[in-house]
Amino acid sequence: MVPKVVDLQRIANDKTRITTYKKRKASLYKKAQEFSTLCGVETCLIVYGPTKATDVVISEPEIWPKDETKVRAIIRKYKDTVSTSCRKETNVETFVNDVGKGNEVVTKKRVKRENKYSSWEEKLDKCSREQLHGIFCAVDSKLNEAVTRQERSMFRVNHQAMDTPFPQNLMDQQFMPQYFHEQPQFQGFPNNFNNMGFSLISPHDGQIQMDPNLMEKWTDLALTQSLMMSKGNDGTQFMQRQEQPYYNREQVVSRSAGFNVNPFMGYQVPFNIPNWRLSGNQVENWELSGKKTI
């Protein structure tokens, strides 16, 4: 059997309302006792009974359990718990101080933000048109100076990156031959160096036995002329002068073929002089003399 649904609203009939109160009060006390016993918790009830429609005086409250001491102990315990849980206390003075500090922090943040991202200076409102034009020209000039300074700095950095530092140990004679030996692409001094019409080193290094004395002679010559090595953009080694270019101020005169045969008479270097190195008259004199190449 389905239980009847109770209409939850105040009972208008006084007699029926008082009867319902007595029944439900007994049921409520029974449930409170079961709850306290089964769960092991302290429980108390304070109930104010109903009054008639014409009765203004409120009836005496009813308590459960009937022992008033137990009820007061539970109420006192509740009050103590509530008072200790509210640890944060304040008064009017503290509240006003907290509000003032909060407003001060907000004001500082606003001023800092305005100073950092300022879009207009109030002093400019009092300037004339000529003064504003002068300020505009000054700002434009400062901007151009900054751009020019930045371009110069970039050019200086790029120029320094293109320059190859000069190896200082090349100026020492004991490191100069080793440096030349480690450069396979270096074949010798350039042609016509110091008015000599032939290369000092043959491009075929494997066919000629190098003389250590001759290598030392070339090292001394390079140090005398203040030569240095630099590397090009493609990795090629070039011979360049350290300071002023060297010019041979001797008068250029026609030299005999015998002069160009072997400028280093004390060294055994087997090499021949090709005909294209000599002028026409020198070739004829060489062939008519009947001399043989070394």
UniProtKB/Swiss-Prot annotation:
GO terms for molecular function: cis-regulatory region sequence-specific DNA binding; DNA-binding transcription factor activity; DNA-binding transcription factor activity, RNA polymerase II-specific; protein dimerization activity. Pfam families: SRF-TF. Its main location: nucleus. The keyword DNA-binding applies. It is found in: Nucleus. Residues 1-51 form the MADS-box domain. Coiled coil: none annotated. The keyword Nucleotidyltransferase does not apply. PROSITE patterns: MADS_BOX_2. SMART domains: MADS. Keywords: DNA-binding, Nucleus, Transcription, Transcription regulation. InterPro entries: MADS-box/MEF2_TF, SRF-like_MADS-box, TF_MADSbox, TF_MADSbox_sf. GO terms for cellular component: nucleus. It comes from the Eukaryota. GO terms for biological process: positive regulation of transcription by RNA polymerase II. Interacts with MEE14/CBP1. PANTHER family: SERUM RESPONSE FACTOR HOMOLOG. Probable transcription factor that may function in the maintenance of the proper function of the central cell in pollen tube attraction. This is Agamous-like MADS-box protein AGL82.
